[in-house]
Amino acid sequence: MNNKSVLTRIKNWNLLLPVVSLLLVMAVNIIHDAAIGANPLSFFMITLRQTTGNGTILYGRIIDILNRGSEVAILAIGMTLVVSSSAGTDISVGSVMSLCASFCCMLLAGYGVSSTTTLAVPLIVGILGGIFIGVLCGMFNGTLVAYFHIQPMVATLILFSAARAIGLLLCNDLIVYVRNEAFGFFGGYIGVIPTAFVIAALCIIVTSLFLKKTAMGMYIQSVGINPKASRIAGLNSKRMIFMTYTVCGLFAGIAGIVAASRITSADSNNIGLYFEMDAILSVALGGNSLGGGKFSLAGSIIGAYTIQAITTTLYALGVSSTQAPVFKAIIVILIVAIQAPPLRAFFKRRSAAKQVKGAAA
């Protein structure tokens, strides 16, 4: 195998963009730590630390990234399928997260109760109730996009605007606290490992196995590439698009439960805030085209944790939480620009010209 073929394979690797982005974030952390006189490799250090609430746990920046980035990773699974099938995005996932968290905590605490340590209903009822609301929201979005042919961004803008308000109504404009050990488990630790990361890993594994063991992944990509041709070939394009939005709502519900459990409360104003942007950015950073079609779930997951690594790095560099979205928006613009057909065609022409020139020489 010659050097040219190796370079070609690297250039065509679908995980090139997320892996390079992650390596760049690591490099920035190493340089920053060295500049302030800290251990340049402190970013990679993982230790055991004793805590009052969770006992002995794994501690370190990488562990924090894996823990804090789990909700976005869960959202990125559903967002990847939505983008692939409909060439659109679900901008309601952050608000749906908030609504699911509010409904779950309202069930667990009891309507009108602002704080409790005892559960009004069994824990499983509250958890499934919150997830069910997410599924309903996904079905609502899927119906508008697939059957009413409304543009995805416009269709999901409805719940983007309304879901948080509905959550506030359910909680009587209050932050509902559920200070219960069983409920807090989902935002805590299993042994030394963050529970949120375990839940995210299970969601990723189950989805990956489902897509690989069935033809569903191929069907979704086919619908995203050409819905008319897929319909002629016998696929129900509308049903496939409806299903992906429903699944996206399901994962938004799971992410909402994890987020609420992490803070043992339903804060409708803040849970899932800007998470839709992070989920979309994860898909784009994962090397997936926002124009639909072929997708890489692994790329989206790497992209999700890269986004969290970027967020952690920005905070370490002194960027405030209100300024961080500006930097993320710049990254989105750059990624979308790189994926733009005219720019990609330009680079292909340059590459072809170099090959012709090399052959002539």
Where are each of the predicted segments found?
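Cytosolic-side transmembrane-helix boundaries in multi-pass membrane proteins
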Residues: 1-44, 228, 232, 236-239, ...
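Hydrophobic core segments of alpha-helical transmembrane domains in multi-pass membrane transport
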Residues: 17-31, 79, 131-134, 160-165, ...
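Single transmembrane alpha-helix segments in multi-pass membrane proteins
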Residues: 29, 58-111, 145-148, 283, ...
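Inter-helical junctions in multi-pass inner-membrane proteins, predominant
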Residues: 35-40, 54-64, 211, 217, ...
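Transmembrane helix-bundle core of multi-pass membrane transporters
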Residues: 43, 52, 148, 152-213, ...
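Alpha-helical transmembrane segments within multi-pass membrane transporters and channels
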Residues: 113-159, 303
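Helix-loop-helix "hairpin" substructures at the membrane interface of multi-pass membrane proteins
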Residues: 125, 137, 192-267
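Transmembrane alpha-helical segments in multi-pass inner-membrane proteins
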Residues: 252, 263, 267-329
